[in-house]
From Swiss-Prot:
Lipid bilayer topology: Single-pass type I membrane protein
Organism listed in the record: Caenorhabditis elegans
Compartments where located: Postsynaptic cell membrane; Synapse
Function: Accessory protein required for glutamate-gated currents. May participate in the gating of non-NMDA (N-methyl-D-aspartate) ionotropic glutamate receptors such as glr-1.
Transmembrane segments: 572-592
Protein's name according to its UniProt entry: Suppressor of lurcher protein 1
Source organism phylogeny: Eukaryota, Metazoa, Ecdysozoa, Nematoda, Chromadorea
Gene3D superfamilies to which the protein is assigned, alphabetical: Spermadhesin, CUB domain
Amino acid sequence: MCRRAEDLVLLLIPILFGYFSHASEHECKCVLFNVTSGNFHSPEFPAPLEGVPCLFYHFQAPPDHIIRLTFDVFQLPPRIGVCSSSIMLFDHSTDGLIEFGERADFEFCGKEISSGRQFFSKDQHFLLQISSGKESSRGFRGSFLAIPKKNFTSDAVEMAECSYRVEKQKAIIYSPDYPYYYPSKVNCTYHIPQRKGFQIVVNSIVMDIGRDAILQIFESVEGKFEKRLIEMVTSVQKSIYVSSTSSLLIYFSAGNNDVERAVGFVIELQYSNAVWSQSPETASECQLNINSENFKEGQLSSDKIGRFTSSSLPTKCQIVLQGYPNEKISVKFTHFNLYVPDNKNVTKRCTEVDNLSADVRVGSRLSRIDEWCGKRAPPNLMSSSNLLQLEYNTKSSKAIRESTNDDIGFRLDYKFHTDWNMGNMKAKVDKKKECRFSFNSSEHTNGKLWSANYPGLYPRNLYCEYIFHGRNDQVVHIHFEYFDIEGFNQCDETTQSDYILFSNYQTHDRTNRRFCGKTAPKGPILSESNYFRMIFSTNDIFDATGFYAHYQFITQEKSQISRVKLTISSSQTPFSSFFLVILLFTFRYIANIF
């Protein structure tokens, strides 16, 4: 498709950005992106796009990789019957070549590509064709990334063609060719064998099957031939959750997918062995399990828990709140006053007096948040997974507690939820991302934003994105009113710090520093353009109360100089940047000749 231009400069300088070829018959030029990540945009962006009759962008990944394109800006003249200007995507080429006149897999114009939309190639080549008439438009901008195909390999043993057996404690299975759309007429089976003392939990991460497809889950007992249908998924269903102590067989029949091009499914499978239930010896002391299958929200009081209602002895009680795999748990204390003898000092340690501790599940282990005693009430708590455990330890007897005139004990409200409880932030929530919020100036020119569970402790192992989209002539100001992010120094991995990072790109931006600690950034944070991204990342070690900020889209005067910034990889030396500039000017010179 793209041929190397016979030019001395191109022969001497390694190609960092791409190269042009002159097709004498069809007058198409081609730019090759042969690095693993970077940014792309319409010619001369942010200057208007016009008068580009035929230009190809060829994205080439290493072998056994695929290409992902992500758009953050897309605005061409609108479709009036047909597109006067458009981009066409060819996502299935095996060698980077297409035939003249070959029909594209996708054609877009107007505002038909929303911000954040992603496209995947089937193999290592992805071709994007630009065709622009005389009518000017804003153009487009995005990022590309080469991804190893092995990232989408099912955690299962392939017994025959598209027939798998799951043998791991926890596994993820993918539909054929995911994240590319699955082929038509394919039939696949996934066998999850029974394990004594375990239940199998099936939870969908992605569920997008076409109208002609069907996914069925059958239950059977090992050693027996009969099976029972327990779940049937069609195109209208976007999620599944199934648990069983028997063997499971997942059967997928694709039907025809040539037109609809559904991407299929990503399903998480896990053997759950009642880790959180107690042995008869310990369970007899005090154990309370609250499951979201029965109660999505409710209240709890310490004087209603287990042996606290009758025992006169010191004891401890575990309260386990467990939801579905896609749920989180929030806890808010409405009363907290634990008994403390007059001769005890609880300013430093709570272990010698009545206390309450909280743990959350991180991976396969429980991680302690903190412990509280006296009248120091816990902050609002939120888990990042589907399990949160409280443990109430009493050193005092019931008689001593009741002898006081104080209201001894605690009361709390709990809630199971699938979102981050941030609906009041007036942001658009990306359902395909775990924690992504978008702010568009067409809806609100200013507003507030905050960390999950603010003003309580933010969850652990969190990665949240706050995306800002303004008009062409707008930038974004962000000003922090409250800032408490656990960390210090450079806020990097060596200090095990949580952090906030700002970026003007969708890919990783090393030019912007991280922020953490208790000191907010000085003055407002200002974006370079109308697109801005704020990242909030937490680890699984420590906690803090997060941040509260306000944002505003501000209209600026248009620059007298049109500046173009081309970024292909995350790092370039001054030497390579110098030759890149020479190369770009050479391309323009060649283009003018032809």
